């Protein structure tokens, strides 16, 4: 029952603060086992919860993070869960202080009657998937979705992981490889 994502009700009782006391633990809601038969969703759970663990401070209460984890398990039941996941990751980054406000940093360009967004850095011009800038989570084009995940991975790497000497989480790499299949 100790699966990532299961909700528990934990009650601690002791006669006084100096005594060990006892714990009463009950499973409140089983979530992860619902997805054991889906390799992509299971990999997504491991990757996402690993990201939460990596980005949050241990033993610090954060109700907003708790709420979006609940939202995560709700949209995972939907058919278009993968496009919602990108916006969930952006919200997680925002809650931990790494807001990626794409609308304010992109430049718009029209090529062959198609609107494209890009960001220019010192050494490259990186195209941003339109649905991320326009905040349209009803996207069906898998290539755009995958490019969105790669963009978030690059942002994670350059802004959070490398400055703190943390390697890219293996669970995320495995998840990206799983959804590519």
Where in this protein do the model-derived segments appear?
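Non-catalytic alpha-helical scaffolds and adjoining flexible linkers that form interface surfaces
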Residues: 1-181
